[in-house]
């Protein structure tokens, strides 16, 4: 996931941060895992929600739209505000929104309440990501690539766990078992309270200190505009594809191959796990053959497998989606955003 607060400045000279704070990086990575696990859980139970509320595919899309409007569009606004006014305790507060959304979803009896629950979970995500990414950078001790990699990998593997846990805990027993995942949100709140205390201490220690001068020569405006344009196209295409697969892949498997909801959720887990693995594989591969080739290869490489997908058997559908997930995610390993080509 692209987080708006990666532009936060590294700790200035004289900061209380001495070296890489691995305990904080571990805590924020675990919190990211729990947060993104809960986010993907919402997508994984779409077939259950459709059956319970007799939803059309348009209504399923409305759930995704509501979630994305709060989780994605709010995030840069919150990041912009917290860049100017850091809010250390926004981390547990954001997870509180997620907790509220989970509890509401577990007892929701109407479609509007499901939409409200999705909005609360999305709001929690939009509050969590900017400040948690900032914390990862602050705790890096200058090793920004390592810090962002640990942070992002936690989120990616959390995303893959959601469908698997939904298949084991929710699908056999019903929507009410969503409430059990509030324990994960509570655990994240406890962890984030400790992280927030550390964050507040670092903020006070560096307040009023001059920012470290940049050692990089500014790029021409035309180069920056062109690079940002390409980046936006890549991000849009990746997340458009991911949102489409995450929202409708389970329905596709159920309707075309007649598999159970649990089986479909396990296939979704395999796809999202492949996405997480692709993020890790893309880094060393890019270092070896060049990041530019990996980026363009990931764009063109997924296309032939996608075109074959509608004609594949269930077995080959599972294989193809895993390959697509690895290729698609290899274009954006987390540490690349911290480097200059």
Task: Give names to the regions the model predicted.
Residues 54, 86, 107-112, 141, ...:
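Helix-breaking motifs and short loop linkers at transmembrane-helix boundaries and internal kinks
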Residues 181, 194-217:
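Flexible cytoplasmic inter-helical loops of multi-pass small-molecule transporters
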Residues 40, 68-76, 159-160, 272-280:
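Residue-level signature of mid-helix packing/kink "hotspots" within the transmembrane helices
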Residues 117-154:
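Cytoplasmic helix-loop-helix junction between adjacent transmembrane helices
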Residues 42-43, 224-276:
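Extracytoplasmic gate region of multi-pass secondary transporters
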Residues 73-112:
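Conserved MFS/SLC helix-loop-helix module at the cytosolic interface between two early adjacent transmembrane helices
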Residues 151-198:
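Helix-loop-helix hairpin linking two adjacent transmembrane segments in secondary transporters
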Residues 286-335:
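C-terminal transmembrane helical hairpin of 12-TM major facilitator-type secondary transporters
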């Amino acid at each position: 996931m692209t987080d708006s607060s990666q532009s936060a400045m590294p700790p200035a000279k004289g900061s209380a941060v001495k070296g890489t704070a691995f305990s904080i990086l571990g805590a924020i990575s675990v919190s990211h895992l729990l947060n993104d696990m809960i986010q993907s859980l919402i997508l994984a139970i779409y077939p259950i929600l459709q059956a319970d509320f007799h939803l059309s595919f348009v209504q399923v899309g409305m759930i995704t739209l509501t979630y994305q409007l709060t989780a994605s569009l709010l995030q840069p606004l919150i990041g912009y505000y917290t860049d100017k006014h850091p809010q250390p305790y926004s981390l547990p507060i954001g997870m509180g929104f997620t907790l509220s959304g989970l509890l509401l979803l577990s007892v929701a009896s109407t479609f509007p309440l499901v939409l409200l629950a999705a909005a609360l979970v999305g709001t929690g995500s939009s509050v969590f990501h900017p400040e948690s990414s900032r914390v990862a950078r602050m705790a890096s001790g200058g090793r920004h690539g390592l810090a962002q990699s640990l942070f992002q990998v936690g989120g990616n593997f959390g995303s893959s766990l959601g469908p698997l846990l939904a298949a084991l805990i929710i699908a056999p027993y019903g929507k009410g078992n969503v409430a059990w995942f509030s324990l994960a949100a509570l655990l994240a709140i406890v962890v984030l309270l400790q992280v927030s205390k550390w964050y507040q201490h670092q903020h006070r220690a560096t307040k009023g200190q001059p920012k470290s001068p940049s050692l990089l020569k500014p790029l021409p405006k035309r180069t920056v505009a062109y690079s940002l344009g390409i980046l936006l196209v890549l991000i849009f295409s990746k997340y458009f594809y991911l949102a489409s697969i995450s929202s409708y892949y389970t329905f596709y498997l159920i309707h075309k191959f007649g598999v159970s909801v649990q089986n479909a959720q396990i296939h979704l887990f395999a796809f999202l796990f492949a996405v997480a693995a692709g993020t890790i594989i893309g880094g060393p591969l890019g270092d070896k053959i060049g990041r530019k080739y990996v980026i363009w290869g990931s764009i063109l490489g997924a296309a032939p497998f996608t075109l074959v997908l509608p004609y594949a058997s269930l077995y080959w559908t599972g294989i193809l989606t895993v390959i697509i997930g690895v290729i698609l995610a290899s274009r954006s390993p987390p540490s690349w955003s911290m480097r200059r080509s």
